[in-house]
């Protein structure tokens, strides 16, 4: 600063400052300027001090000498996840409480036995068998909502638990390279059997603290971008990708929406379809909506047995559709969220079996099953080329839905549209093409032949057939005269109708002689059809629409139907129901078209719409029609009868009514025939059962006679003395005695059977059945064996039971104790029952019945002898 005095007055630069504390040593500059102070030069010393707090020095995350072969193969300094040192506390689900009570009873019995020294092993074994049976029944018949609770079990193994159990090496990778690392999604490189994979999955917590840290496995956009980054990394280096799905859904808070939650999910969906490496998705818990799909667009979707995959949580669905959270069980049933339901819908590609009570009961075994499934799926996918992999992934999702989309197959449009421009000018009205005379004559000749075939020669006294023939000849002449333009006015359609009515009456009179083979109602219906085909409307000036079916085509269809009915009656078989239904549908279309034309011509379109609306409201409310509405309907029908084509409409309605009656009669006849057949079969079964009981009774009487009983006991004691369970250990003399005893029993039994009223035929053993059926029996055995193999390889339940049986046999070491033997027997019975239920095929049943039906025809058949107990052994 200059040594001369400086007066700080007036408007100086310091006046622009607004701070009241700016100045020299805390004195404002503005105050200094006003006071007119004179500043002298002096030495100024300025010192700046800062107090720094003591901070903890951060350690570098990478170890100076990492051990890649440490236990579990994980570089622990890259992951905060550690396996639990102690098993978690057991959590009892609501539906498991009955099992817990049984378990407490077993423990109480054991404590009592230890304290008192009383042997309660039998009671304990019985309770354990009962507990095991209840456990199997409970977990093999879980409802969808119960599987949801198992999938959400707090102790269920998480994604990183499986990584720790099934990988030789695993390095967790972090970050989305945009400044955030979402803990809800974990990912890393791992190796299985020497092959490197990129593993990505939702990570849930194992306690409340971990769940809060992991955000309950609900990812934010950062998590999906992190997953996409690592997928692209794996795609670049050629690592197959395995994703693990276990999330209730994407995190739906306001900030996630602002950061682009929907965009991140959509970006993942699009990018996953373009990955050039195999992709497998495994649902290990619950898969919720888009949060699961964002890492679930894979070539194969596998599901654990108790996992669920849904578009909306059952609780949310119940609240939306049924306005109550209590409707969650119904919603879970309707949503089809279980693994088995999704496998049937071809959404899931496979089911990985779980331990009996869920994956949380044996996490290590569960991880090994997942490992096996990954290896099998990867062996299949690695054989495909890159192009085939992408196509396979696309087709998997394209075929989803009710009908699915089949690629490369042209689809014919349901409604074709003519896009050609209409030519200028009014096209001439097309005239109705008349039915050819030859066709009408052929129709009448066929009808005449059908009626004459229905007569009996014994009814020639009345000779109604000749009267019908003359009536038809007269009808033919009238029709040919009517076709002549000069005589058309002389022969109106009413005369033709009168002759047809007369013809109908003559036939009905002839029908009373009970000589007609063809049902009268059918012939009458055919005459009505012919009448409508021949009758030409007097109003020939009306224009014919392009979509109208010509009368000749209707006549041909009715002729085909009549021929089918007549041939079906002559051959004692039913007429083709397809032709009848087709004719009815054709007539319905014609009636609807004529009705639409009549409504349009009478100007009743708006009235019809109004009436339909009022009738629909009345039906919806289950209320009768009001008198006013009935009057309006009656007025509508009267006005409709004035339409130009009303007579055509009435004729076609009558024809439709008659054909429908024929169909009803045929259906009724079919039902009656079916009822008679069922009754006959029932009577046969009852008679067979009665005879079987009678034969058993007679056999018991024969065996209970003192002489036979004494010989039987003597032979039995000799066989026991020889100590031979098969015939190879018996001497010739003893064999001879047994044969003689069998002959004596057969003779006594034959005498007893004759007293029942049955005939006995002597047939050598083994010759009572048809040798030609041997190939059929072998084929049936092969089919049954094939079905059993398919079920054993495809059913998760059967697989699990077989694995448990193998494990139980291995534990026993070939010498099972009573407890182990009971468990083995229980598992064997369960496997047999499951196989029997799964192989319950109608085709196999039919083959078996065809083979076994002749077995009861002769008494000496080996199977019948075994059935009534003749072939007893002496062991």
Curated annotation (Swiss-Prot):
GO terms for cellular component: acetyl-CoA carboxylase complex; chloroplast inner membrane. One of its GO terms (molecular function) is acetyl-CoA carboxylase activity. Pathway: Lipid metabolism; malonyl-CoA biosynthesis; malonyl-CoA from acetyl-CoA: step 1/1. One of its GO terms (biological process) is fatty acid biosynthetic process. Gene3D superfamilies: 2-enoyl-CoA Hydratase, Chain A, domain 1. InterPro entries: Acetyl_CoA_COase_a_su, ClpP/crotonase-like_dom_sf, COA_CT_C. The keyword ATP-binding applies. Residues 1-50 form a transit peptide. Transmembrane segments: none annotated. It is found in: Plastid, Chloroplast inner membrane. Residues 845-875 are annotated as: Disordered. Residues 860-869 have a biased composition (Basic and acidic residues). Residues 664-705 form a coiled coil. It is a peripheral membrane protein. Activated by reductants such as dithiothreitol (DTT), and by thioredoxin in vivo, following exposure to light. Its EC number is 2.1.3.15. Its main location: plastid. Acetyl-CoA carboxylase is a heterohexamer composed of biotin carboxyl carrier protein, biotin carboxylase and two subunits each of ACCase subunit alpha and ACCase plastid-coded subunit beta (accD). NCBIfam families: accA (TIGR00513), AccA_sub (NF041504), PRK05724.1 (NF004344). HAMAP family: AcetylCoA_CT_alpha (MF_00823). Belongs to the AccA family. This is Acetyl-coenzyme A carboxylase carboxyl transferase subunit alpha, chloroplastic. The gene is ACCA.
